[in-house]
């Protein structure tokens, strides 16, 4: 593998988290990863930074600080209103190359996976995808990513020795969401955005809501398999009592 864009001797001792937002709301998985990032940063006595691209998103920066971030780098631009891989990929790449964090984490959403793969190639670094746990090797100051395979029968522990940033995407729902601390203070940094309309090759013509529940946002999920023989009414009643929703295997 060729050398990455920056090496371990050039890195800043910080954990960075990509904060994905949709129509003015931070994705739950971004807040979950931010909570875990706080834990990792505290172990190493490093700084936790959130990276927030969008349009009119400064209020979300304050929310992220209450969830544990020390700094939020805001990239506010009309061309970032809706996620596009060209726009978000460009501004996030520029910001990471400016800050050179040791660790960069993203939620494993559709957009997060798209962005992470593209950035890993541009950084010439590795990417540990769909991680189920993260912890620090304190002795060597390395991120240890746990990735399951073969239906969960094998768990690999992966470290990135020399390439930076150490990148990982995290599955939704694997980390607990920390309680917001309204008294917490942090720094909001406005990062200049140099984007031109001709850079954006993707246009959103129409958005159609499917009406299907986003299971990653459901607090309780009651799941039935073939054994219920298609009779989900009891499960629906139980899910209603528990304040959740119904799924199937």
Outline where the language-model segments fall.
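N-terminal glycine-rich FAD/FM-binding segment characteristic of electron-transfer flavoproteins
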Residues: 1-249
């Amino acid at each position: 593998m060729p050398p990455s864009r920056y090496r371990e001797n050039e890195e800043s001792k910080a954990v960075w988290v990509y904060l994905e937002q949709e129509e003015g709301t931070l994705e739950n998985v971004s807040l979950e990863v931010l909570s875990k990032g706080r834990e990792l940063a505290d172990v190493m006595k490093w700084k936790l930074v959130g990276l927030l691209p969008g349009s009119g998103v400064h209020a979300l920066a304050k929310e992220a600080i209450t969830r544990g971030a020390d700094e939020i780098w805001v990239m506010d631009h009309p061309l970032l209103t809706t996620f596009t891989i060209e726009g978000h990929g460009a501004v996030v790449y520029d910001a990471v190359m400016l800050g050179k964090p040791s660790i960069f984490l993203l939620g494993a959403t559709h957009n997060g996976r798209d962005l992470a793969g593209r950035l890993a190639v541009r950084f010439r670094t590795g990417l540990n995808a769909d991680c189920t746990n993260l912890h620090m090797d304190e002795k060597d100051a390395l991120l240890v990513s746990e990735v399951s395979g073969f239906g969960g029968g094998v768990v690999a522990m992966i470290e990135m020795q020399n390439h930076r940033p150490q990148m990982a995407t995290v599955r939704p729902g694997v980390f607990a969401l920390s309680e917001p601390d309204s008294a917490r203070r942090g720094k909001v940094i406005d990062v200049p955005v140099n984007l031109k309309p001709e850079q954006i090759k993707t246009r959103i013509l129409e958005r159609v809501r499917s009406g299907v529940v986003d299971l990653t946002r459901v607090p309780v999920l009651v799941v039935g398999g073939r054994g219920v023989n298609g009779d989900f009414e009891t499960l629906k009643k139980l899910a209603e009592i528990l304040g959740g929703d119904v799924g199937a295997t």
